[in-house]
A protein has these predicted regions:
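Metal-dependent amide/peptide-bond hydrolase catalytic core
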Residues: 1-121
């Protein structure tokens, strides 16, 4: 508006690639959440809130079906990625257990997609 009112021109360019919004595949999310719940995980963080930070997973999600789920760390005090308190959540026996659960979830979800062609439709 200001450029138009003063007769000035404005030009700009991005100095790096932009991050696209996340296009989460609803079917994959539902399958993965159900699998996580079967494995005893119930602390999901809802995706309708504004996320802090940025990621290229949004770009990926526009190129292929993507499933992105955030889980609560249940840490006290709360721990968020990229801060020192988060290190306690990603080291030690609990971290290895969570890695095993995540691996099982991805494998079982992929198996369901392969065995049920209606999911891909």
């Amino acid at each position: 508006g200001a450029a138009l009112m003063t007769g000035a021109t404005l030009s700009y360019r991005n100095f790096e690639n932009s991050y696209d919004d996340l296009d989460n595949n609803k079917k994959l999310v539902a399958i993965s959440k159900a699998t996580l719940e079967d494995l005893g995980v119930h602390d999901f963080i809802e995706q309708d809130r504004d996320a802090a930070g940025s990621s290229d997973i949004g770009n990926v999600s526009h190129a292929c079906p993507t499933c992105y789920i955030e889980l609560d760390t249940n840490a006290n005090p709360p721990a968020y990625a990229h801060n020192e308190d988060f290190l306690k959540c990603v080291t030690g026996p609990l971290a290895y257990h969570n890695l095993a659960v995540a691996s099982k979830t991805m494998a079982y979800s992929a198996l369901q997609v392969l065995l049920d062609p209606s999911i891909v439709e």
